[in-house]
Each structure stands twice: as C-alpha cells, then as structure tokens.
A protein has these predicted regions:
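Non-ligating segments of multi-cofactor redox enzymes
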Residues: 1-244
Length: 245
C-alpha cells in the first residue's frame, strides 16, 4: 500500500512538472525553426532555471536576469529580479525546484532508469551541498560585477542552457554549427557528466551546483508551501527521501 501511494505521488509530481515545462516553454515549434522567441513576455522571469535561449521559452531565467543587472556595462540594482525571487521564495521555497524546474524534471526522468546501485548519500555529501552557495556568490554575483562580457555561470556551467538552448539551436541553425568550438564541447561534457551522475544520485545538479536552488533554499524553512519532518514521531519519510532532506 505504501509503495502504491509513493508511485502514485511520483506520477502526480511528474504531471505537474510536465505542465510547468509547457507553461514556461509554450512555443515548441521554435525548436524546429532554430530561433529564439523575442516576444514581450521575455522581459518576465520564469520561476525555474528555464534558459532564455531555449527556442520555446516564453520568459527569462532569473539567474540570467540577475547576472545581466549586475554587469558594470549597464549597472542597475536588480529590484525586479530580487523582488521576484523574494516573492516566489516566500510563497514556495524549494517546491519550485521539485515541481517547476525543467532541468529538475530531466534529472528525475534519468534517475528513474534502472541502475544496479542508487546512491542515497555518501561521506562528504553535506559538505558538497555548500558548493551551490559558492556558485551563487562567485559565478553569479561576484565575477559579473567585475567583467562586463562574461556571464560565467551560463558560459561555463549551466546544463539547462546547454540542453534546452545551445544543443537545439546548434542542431537547427547551420550558422551556429560552423561556430562550434571548445566551449560548446566543454558545456556538453558538463551536461553529460551530470546526466550520468543522475543515474546514481537524485538531482546532482540541484543538490550541489544550482544557484537558483541555493536562493530558494534560504526561504525553505518559512515558505508558505513546504515540507516539514518531525523526526521524533516518524522516520519513514526521512528514510525514503531521495534528497535526504
């Protein structure tokens, strides 16, 4: 009975995740055209790590918007982006990560592939989780403040941008294929590594590297929509949680 409830709950979550993906990326035909939508809604942020360069995207990524606002070339205090993150953080916390983020959905689907050994936790797991705060402070905030031309997180690390933006655009746009170089293959390597790790570990990018998850995590304890665990009365949820919350 417990297993049936768990499976049913997982399918419900996958349904919400799929719906969230379509809401954030409604212009699917652009995948075949090799173009980026530039409609009026692109000035608005999506709640998840949804790449602006994704051909189907109807909005902007909040991390990308934050980086753009911090560049010295056109410095401005990111009132809108910070207000957006504050609002969604207070309302939902990391529920956004588990139910709305497109790359979170991809990792969940990969984790469902049968594999001989799934890793729930390991020595050093808690320390590695601090990496995402370093990514936020260094790659997203500090470095863009001193370099006008390099959005470091997206240029060197972001797997969501590679999967939903760079790869589809390169496949459908001959001009871009002619410009493929080391940086493209570096980001493909990062993406492949994270997807392979997703066979073993639930959401490795979310756990260890995602700066948006780091921001939402700051609100998790007092978000209106969140998860609580009373260890004094029940250990079932803690034992079965893939994320080891």
């Amino acid at each position: 009975m417990a297993k049936e409830k768990r499976v049913k709950g997982e399918w419900k979550r996958l349904t919400v995740q799929a719906a969230a993906f379509l809401l954030q990326n409604p212009k699917l035909h652009n995948f075949f055209l090799g173009t980026i939508d530039t409609g009026k809604t692109k000035v608005l942020c999506a709640p998840g790590l949804n790449c602006y360069s994704c051909p189907a995207a109807a909005g902007a990524c909040p991390i990308g918007s934050l980086q753009s606002a911090l560049t010295p070339r056109k410095p401005s205090f990111p009132f809108y982006v910070l207000g957006f993150l504050l609002l969604f953080g207070v309302l939902f916390g990391r529920w956004i990560c588990s139910h709305v983020c497109p790359f979170g959905l991809v990792q969940d689907l990969v984790y469902k592939i049968p594999f001989p050994k799934k890793v729930r936790t390991f020595k050093g797991d808690r320390i590695l989780r601090l990496l995402k705060y370093a990514v936020l402070l260094v790659l997203v905030i500090a470095l863009p403040l001193f370099d006008t031309l390099k959005p470091y997180f997206y240029k060197y690390l972001c797997p969501s941008g590679t999967l939903f933006g760079a790869i589809p655009l390169t496949l459908t746009n001959p001009m871009l294929r002619g410009q493929i170089g080391f940086l493209f293959w570096w980001k493909v390597g990062v993406l492949v590594t994270l997807l392979l790790l997703s066979l073993l570990i639930a959401r490795p990018f979310c756990r260890y590297l995602c700066p948006l998850g780091a921001i939402y995590g700051l609100f998790n304890r007092f978000a209106l929509l969140g998860l609580t665990c009373d260890a004094s009365t029940c250990e079932i949820g803690r034992a079965s949680c893939r994320e080891r919350v």
